[in-house]
Structures are given as structure tokens and as C-alpha cells.
């Protein structure tokens, strides 16, 4: 029987563009309608933001011990831009663990996470950083982060389904470049760097749902949503200003769409192959999604209808490339 739902959707946009809000919206749509109207099955969700949060938490604990930070120099962009690839490799690993329902049973979830960070970074060309910490430092920060790391691991395992029938894996991430940068972006900036870092198994099945906002609008929304009491939340975390301007001052998705070899796709050269990844664009330049951060019972019907139309326009365009 033909499966009429996307297997993998890359949900991509600048931070605070509405990605998590759209994901939250889809979680509250009846499964049958989600499939029939949007070609999206029950969501299995992967997101690199929890890893960004834990990178910052590791650095915070290192700083408390008067040790050098390894990921960020403070409220600023990565020390090593190749860590955008580290994040992609972590998502690749999460994808493989999901598909194989791999269950890890470590004595220390934090130390397992440290090892995963080093392994993913090695795949992006970065030498070990956490594995070379002295034993006392490593043990101390592992103890301080164990509760958070264990919760992440438990949540990951809890997301494994009994079956993948009528399921869609939603992989959420944000990429960009410096404010005012010329196109094409180069180096480790933008989707031009990160998309080829995804594994073949993802790229072969992926469709991109891109949420389009202007940098000015996303900066406004970032300030509106930021809750200092909930920095690890998908819906309420904020991005530091230096990062907004240095890493997310612009993005290159519009450029990649315009220069793709095939219309309504993004051309990705990776793993010795060329992938033409279909893309649909949700135009959120005039904010349609901020209300979705509230409780569902407060969602106004006319605003829900606007979101329905915008998502359906994007997913219908994506589905025009679908082969089952």
C-alpha cells in the first residue's frame, strides 16, 4: 500500500521564526486530518536545540571551575564554526538510533553525552575536547549535568514508536550567517554547509519545510518569546544578540532555492551524489504563528485557519515531488 505521508521533513528557518510553534500546532491536529491535508504522519521529533543548550551548560560548568570553555566564548557564536556540523552529526545519530530503536543504558548519561559530542565533532573535523579533560573536571561537570542529561536520554527513548507506518520524522534546526553577508554564504555558515552534513539516509527521503521570515522580524519575535526562567525550552528560549547578528543575521535558503538545478528543490551535493531536496515555503514574514505559544484553547479560529492555509500551501508544493 502506498504511504501518502512524508517520511522525513527538515523543518528549517531562522530562530524564533515559528518552527517550534508550527510543530506544536501539528501536534494538536487530528492524525487523519494531518495526513490528508498536510501529508504529514504522526510526528517523531528530532531537534538540535537541546544539544546547543547542553553545550552552553557544559561551558557554564567549566567556567565555574576556572577551566577554558570549549564550545562558546560566552554569549557569542561558536568558538569553532564546524560545530554546526557537530550538531548535524548528532541529529544523524539520533535518526539512526530512532530507526533502530537503540536503547543506551549508561551508568552516567552525562558522560555518554560527552562521548557523543566528541564523536560527532570528530565527524566534522574537530579534535576531542571533552575526552581530554582531566578526570576530576570531567567527573565534576558530569555529576552537575547528570539530571539534565538523563532527562534528555529518557525523552529520546520515549520517542521510539512501535511502528513507523504513517509516521513522519520532523528534524528541526536553524542555520544562518552574519548580518549583511553576501550570497552565497561560505565556510561553515548557512544551509550550504549543514545540509550536506546530513547522512544519505536522511537526504534520500527528506523534504524541506522552510519558514520564511525577515531577520528583523525574527529578532523581534526572539525578544518576545525569551523566558529567562526557561532557557532550555523549545518554545521559550532566547538567542543572545551577538549570536543573532553573527550566526543568524541572514540565511541562505532563498538563495539556494533560486540557484537550485531543479525548480522547487534545494540542490545538495554530498556523499558523492547530488540530491534535489523538495522544498515548501511557509511565508511567515507577517507573523502568523506567535499565538501558538499559548494554550490551544486560547487559539483564535481565524488565526488557526491562516496557519492551516500557509502550511497546506507549502506541503502541497512539497508533495508534488512525492513518489511514495
Show which residues each predicted segment covers.
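Glycine-rich phosphate-binding loop of ATP-dependent small-molecule kinases
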Residues: 1-324
